[in-house]
């Protein structure tokens, strides 16, 4: 048998030595500034913050818990709702005050009256 040629036969057998030293990039120059002298102002007393509830818009000067505030707001809404102005406002309040059972009975009586009004020839 003859010589066996390999695929890698065309490559040289010498290994190339590569310098694998990491290149160090020069660091940019950092400008260090000295802090400027602090300007002293006339000292004023420290201000205290205020809560939004203390703006004077509330009817109660005392602080209310969230549940109490919700109750007060619901009472105000209820009073305003009851101020039904005019005939239509009163009718609306009557309808709203009806329980569901009465409301369903009214609807059923209206439907019965409509059926009775239909005349068959």
Curated annotation (Swiss-Prot):
Residues 1-121 are annotated as: Disordered. Myristoylated. The N-myristoylated protein is further palmitoylated. A lipid is attached at residue 2 (N-myristoyl glycine). It is found in: Cytoplasm, Cytosol. A lipid is attached at residue 8 (S-palmitoyl cysteine). GO terms for biological process: ERAD pathway. Keywords: Cytoplasm, Lipoprotein, Myristate, Palmitate. Residues 11-23, 73-83, 90-105, 112-121 have a biased composition (Basic and acidic residues). One of its GO terms (cellular component) is cytosol. It holds the Pfam family SVIP. It comes from the Eukaryota. To yeast YGL108C. This is Uncharacterized protein new13.
């Amino acid at each position: 048998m003859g010589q066996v040629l390999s695929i890698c036969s065309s490559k040289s057998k010498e290994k190339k030595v590569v310098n694998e030293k990491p290149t160090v990039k020069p660091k940019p120059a950092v400008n260090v500034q000295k802090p400027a002298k602090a300007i002293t102002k006339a000292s004023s007393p420290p201000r205290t913050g205020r809560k939004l509830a203390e703006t004077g818009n509330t009817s109660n000067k005392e602080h209310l818990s969230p549940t109490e505030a919700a109750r007060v707001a619901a009472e105000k809404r209820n009073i305003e709702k009851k101020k039904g102005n005019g005939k239509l406002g009163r009718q609306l309040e009557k309808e709203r005050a009806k329980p569901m059972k009465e409301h369903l009975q009214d609807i059923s009586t209206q439907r019965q009256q409509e059926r009775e009004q239909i005349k068959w020839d």
